[in-house]
Amino acid sequence: MLWEETGAAPAPARASDLPYRISSDHLKKEEKMTMMAHQYPSWIFINEKTFITREQLNSLLKTYNIFYENQKNLHILYGETEDGKLIVEGMLDIFWGVKRPIQLKIQDEKPFSSFTSMKSSDVFSSKGMTRWGEFDDLYRISELDRTQIPMSEKRNSQEDYLSYHSNTLKPHAKDEPDSPVLYRTMSEAALVRKRMKPLMMDRKERQKNRASINGHFYNHETSIFIPAFESETKVRVNSNMRTEEVIKQLLQKFKIENSPQDFALHIIFATGEQRRLKKTDIPLLQRLLQGPSEKNARIFLMDKDAEEISSDVAQYINFHFSLLESILQRLNEEEKREIQRIVTKFNKEKAIILKCLQNKLVIKTETTV
C-alpha cells in the first residue's frame, strides 16, 4: 500500500531513485501536494509527481556549488523560515527562445531622480554601457560610430539622444530617411525600427515620453524587438516561486510589457528533448535536479505555443537530411503494412461472424417449415 494512503512516512529513497516519482492518481491537485508538504516537512516537493529528501537536496546543492566554486554569486543557498519550512534561493540561468517580438514598458515603476541632471554623454558613455551591459545584451545594441552622425546632430546632442543600432543589422539601404520601416537583422533574431529624423519641435515632446528602464532611457526605436536566440540572462528566484512567478520575475527585471501568459518555460536537454515546465513546477529545484552543467540541460523562455519534443523524436533531430528521408520512407512502408495487417485481421473476423449468422438463419428457416 502506498505511503500516502496509510499515513506513514515513506522510506528514504536511494540516490539511484532520484527523483522518486509517484502515480498522478494519488496527487491530482496542488492543494493536496501542499497539505502533504506540511505533513512531511522533511520532504521537498518538486511538483505533484516528484519529491526528494533533505539529504538528497543537500547532495544536489553540494554538487551544484562545487561546480561554481569560483563564482560565489552563482551559489544556491538554503535555510529555514520561522515555521521550520525549508527555502532554497539563488540565481537561475534562463535562455531566450521566443520567436515573437517583446514590448518594453514606456515607464518605470520608480522615478529616476537624476534624470534631469544627467548629461547625454554620461548616460551613453562606454562605462555606462558596461554597467548596464546585461540590459544591452538582451538585444545586442552597440554604440554607433560617432563619425556616422551628421555634424548638425552632434550640436544637438544635449537635446536629443544618441542613436544606437544592432550590431547584426544589415548595411544602411537607400530608403527614404523618414520611412518608418522595420529593419530585419541578418540573423533574423531581432526587429529594430528604423530611426526617423523628427522635426526639432518634436524632439522635446519625445524626450518627455522617455522613461528610465533599468538605467536606460526608453527608446521608441528599440522598444519592440526579438531577443537573440540562446542569449542568456539570470534572475534571482527561490523555491517558493513556481513557473509563472519565475516568468513574472524575468519580465519585471527587464520591464517587459507582455503578459506572463504569453510565455512558457521549457527544459531543453542535450539529447534534443524539449519538455515544458508545468504550472506546479519549481524551476529552481528543476535546475538542481538536472545538475549544474548547461551542457546537459538548459531552461528556456519560449512562446506559450512552443511544442514539446519527446525523447523518441529527439533522437532523430541531429541526423543528416538524407538519413531522415530514408527513415521517414521506412516508417511509411511500415505504416502501410500495419494498416493492411489490421484490415486483413478484421475482415477475417467479420467473415466468421457473417458465416455464423448465415448458418443460424438457415437453421431457423428449416425449423419454421
From Swiss-Prot:
Highest expression in thymus, kidney and placenta. Also detected in colon, small intestine and lung. Tends to be down-regulated in 30-60% of tumors derived from breast, colon, kidney liver, rectum, pancreas, stomach and the thyroid gland compared to the normal counterpart. InterPro entries: RA_dom, RASSF1-6, SARAH_dom, SARAH_RASSF6, Ubiquitin-like_domsf. GO terms for biological process: apoptotic process; positive regulation of apoptotic process; signal transduction. SMART domains: RA (SM00314). The modification Phosphoserine is found at residue 187. Keywords: Apoptosis, Phosphoprotein. Residues 313-360 form the SARAH domain. It holds the Pfam family RA. Residues 218-306 form the Ras-associating domain. The keyword Glycoprotein does not apply. Interacts with MOAP1. Interaction with activated KRAS is still a matter of debate: interaction has been shown in the mouse, but not in human. Lack of interaction with MRAS, NRAS nor RRAS2 has also been reported. Involved in the induction of apoptosis, through both caspase-dependent and caspase-independent pathways. May act as a Ras effector protein. May suppress the serum-induced basal levels of NF-kappa-B. This is Ras association domain-containing protein 6. It comes from Homo sapiens (Human). The gene is RASSF6.
